Design a protein with these regions (language model features):
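Generic short beta-strand segments
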Residues: 45-50, 108-109, 127-129
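Oligomerization/assembly interface segments of phage tail-like spikes and tubes
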Residues: 58-74, 119-131
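Low-complexity, intrinsically disordered Gly/Pro/Thr-rich segments
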Residues: 102-115
């Protein structure tokens, strides 16, 4: 059985090991509080479902939204460039090996950039499926 927490950890590990995203700059999942200074990231995992297609014992589908938060007094291009590099990193077809499963991004959707109080926010949603080994 694939555990949701293990899938979350594998996605984070893949992101932190292959980009300039600093794990110390990850605001808590779904957190509304973001400390001052520099680029910060917020993640929210959503839409976890388990299906049982004929060719696999089970499959987990879900998505994660990554928001890149940047102080509004800085050039917004920095957040946009980082959002694009994250999108490129998870671009299908890609197969990420986990403990007892394979993780495959299926679709990447850039979300509209916005301003929220003192933050510029560039976001994207990564849809994925996880298959047992």
């Amino acid at each position: 059985m694939i555990e949701f927490q293990t899938v979350k950890l594998k996605i984070r590990e893949y992101l932190f090991s292959r980009t300039s995203v600093d794990s110390g700059h990850l605001a808590g999942e779904g957190s509304f509080f973001v400390p001052d200074g520099g680029l910060w990231f917020r993640e929210a995992f959503q839409e976890f479902t388990v299906t049982r297609p004929a060719q696999f014992s089970s499959r987990v589908d879900g998505s994660v939204v990554y928001e890149i938060l940047q102080p509004s007094d800085r050039d917004f291009r920095e957040a946009e460039v980082l959002r694009q590099s994250i999108a490129d990193l998870f671009q299908p077809p890609l197969l990420i090996s986990g403990e007892g499963f394979y993780l495959q991004p299926t679709r990447i959707v850039p979300l509209a950039s916005r301003l929220d109080r003192a933050w510029n926010i560039a976001a994207l949603r990564i849809h994925f499926s996880a298959y047992p080994v």
